[in-house]
UniProtKB/Swiss-Prot annotation:
GO biological process, one term: translation
Lineage, top ranks: Bacteria, Thermotogati, Deinococcota, Deinococci, Deinococcales
Matches recorded under InterPro entries: Ribosomal_uS11, Ribosomal_uS11_bac-type, Ribosomal_uS11_CS, Ribosomal_uS11_sf
Gene source species: Deinococcus radiodurans (strain ATCC 13939 / DSM 20539 / JCM 16871 / CCUG 27074 / LMG 4051 / NBRC 15346 / NCIMB 9279 / VKM B-1422 / R1)
Protein name from the UniProt record: Small ribosomal subunit protein uS11
The keyword Membrane is annotated on this UniProt entry: no
Entries under Pfam families matching the protein: Ribosomal_S11
CC annotations in GO: cytosolic small ribosomal subunit
Keywords, comma-separated and alphabetical: Ribonucleoprotein, Ribosomal protein, RNA-binding, rRNA-binding
Molecular functions (GO terms): rRNA binding; structural constituent of ribosome
Length: 131
């Protein structure tokens, strides 16, 4: 005869994270916003695609704004995050709007840093990216 189940396992208590980092990866095709704790462990993320946009609409500033607001909302409700350092990578059209959305969402922005990868004259760019 089968043993009866013991019921649900106890829920883990909510980790309270007061500060973290918001990484904004802004490419020409999409904008991905990831919220991490100070150790770099991912807490919440969102992108133009997870908001519901497809194709070229994912790269728009409005999609970046919604993605940033969604990621911050997840981090605030799940972990009680109150302050972030914003780190921006890439030169897509959504980068400024994502920063503005993070600032407007009620979370304290302690610093903004641009960490865009810049080649030291590496590979030859494609035809459309050459000046």
């Amino acid at each position: 005869m089968a043993k009866p189940t013991k019921g649900k396992a106890p829920r883990r208590s909510r980790r309270n994270i007061s500060a973290g980092r918001a990484y904004v990866h802004a490419s020409y095709n999409n904008t991905i916003v990831t919220i991490t704790d100070l150790d770099g462990n991912s807490v919440a993320w969102s992108s133009g695609g997870t908001i519901g946009y497809k194709g070229s609409k994912k790269g728009t500033p409005y999609a970046a704004q919604l993605a940033a607001a969604d990621a911050v909302k997840k981090a605030q409700t799940s972990f009680g995050m109150a302050a972030v350092d914003v780190i921006v990578r890439g030169s897509g059209s959504g980068r400024e709007q994502a920063i503005r959305a993070i600032q407007a969402s009620g979370i304290e922005v302690r610093s903004i840093m641009d960490d865009s990868p810049v080649p030291h004259n590496g590979c030859r760019p494609k035809k459309k990216f050459r000046a």
